[in-house]
């Protein structure tokens, strides 16, 4: 009965969050991602689409719109607001999702985050962030309806993101704070309300502690429940990978460059 009461309380909280104005984290992430997309779109336009062609098949193909299909007309901010309106995610989910976008961009530098893939990438990042941070979260079918994709595609997007990130989805408190401070600085530069996130450090610390407790194998179990196929190469992942990721910032095993945009 305690579990049922907790689930009911969490659902009530999510409904209240969804009916509230978007959190400042959402606006900050939207600004930062829009700037990244605008820059990459401009680079691809100048290169005659060569960068876009190189991105396909470089590990992020699942996030690409169908070949020749136009990019979604809805803007990044409006898309995130739609997710907020229906899903009622924790504010920290947006910061963690932005971290995943940055990490994915570093892992697959040939596949630029651009207008043709940003919506699907953000949707997958928010889905995984909610599973990591929230005790009770919406399933893949719900996120698929909110994000405008099929359930099968949502499953593929989730597994594609987890593959790109090597299931390293736990952020240390230090890394979380670096991303949050980066978003605040970008918002202040744009004249936004960067200081609105002041005082969130205590909540961020609690969230960082909970991130370390979620193992890749647990995420695989959740993916299986939601109807996603498991890749044989990922079944060997376990708590050792989770503990390694939770220890803090480290270099990616297959690259000599940092996993993040920050010198930690």
UniProtKB/Swiss-Prot annotation:
Record-linked Pfam families: Cyclin (PF08613)
Organism: Oryza sativa subsp. japonica (Rice)
Domain of life of the source: Eukaryota
InterPro entries: Cyclin-like_sf, Cyclin_PHO80-like
GO function term, MF aspect, one: protein kinase binding
Protein's name in the database: Cyclin-P1-1
Cell cycle among keywords: yes
Keywords tagged on the record: Cell cycle, Cell division, Cyclin
Entry's family note: Belongs to the cyclin family. Cyclin U/P subfamily.
GO process annotations (BP): cell division
Record has Endoplasmic reticulum as a keyword: no
UniProt-annotated stretches for the region Disordered: 1-25
């Amino acid at each position: 009965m305690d579990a049922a009461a907790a689930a009911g309380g969490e659902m009530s909280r999510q409904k209240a969050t969804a009916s509230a104005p978007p959190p400042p984290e959402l606006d900050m992430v939207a600004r930062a991602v829009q700037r990244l997309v605008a820059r990459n779109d401009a680079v691809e336009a100048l290169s005659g689409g060569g960068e876009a062609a190189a991105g396909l098949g470089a590990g992020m193909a699942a996030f690409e719109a169908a070949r020749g299909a136009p990019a979604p007309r809805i803007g990044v901010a409006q898309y995130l607001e739609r997710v907020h309106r229906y899903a009622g995610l924790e504010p920290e989910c947006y910061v963690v999702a932005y971290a995943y976008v940055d990490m994915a961009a570093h892992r697959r530098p040939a596949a630029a985050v651009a207008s043709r893939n940003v919506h699907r990438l953000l949707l997958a990042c928010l889905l995984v962030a909610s599973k990591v941070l929230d005790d009770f979260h919406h399933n893949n079918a719900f996120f698929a309806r909110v994000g405008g994709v099929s359930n099968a595609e949502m499953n593929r997007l989730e597994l594609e993101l987890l593959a790109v990130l090597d299931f390293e989805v736990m952020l240390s408190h230090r890394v979380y704070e670096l991303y949050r401070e980066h978003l605040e600085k970008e918002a202040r530069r744009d004249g936004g309300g960067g200081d609105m996130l002041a005082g969130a450090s205590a909540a961020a610390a609690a969230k960082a502690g909970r991130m370390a407790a979620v193992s890749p194998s647990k995420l695989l179990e959740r993916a299986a429940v939601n109807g996603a196929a498991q890749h044989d190469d990922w079944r060997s992942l376990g708590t050792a990978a989770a503990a390694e990721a939770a220890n803090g910032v480290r270099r990616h095993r297959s690259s000599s460059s940092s996993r993040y945009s920050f010198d930690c």
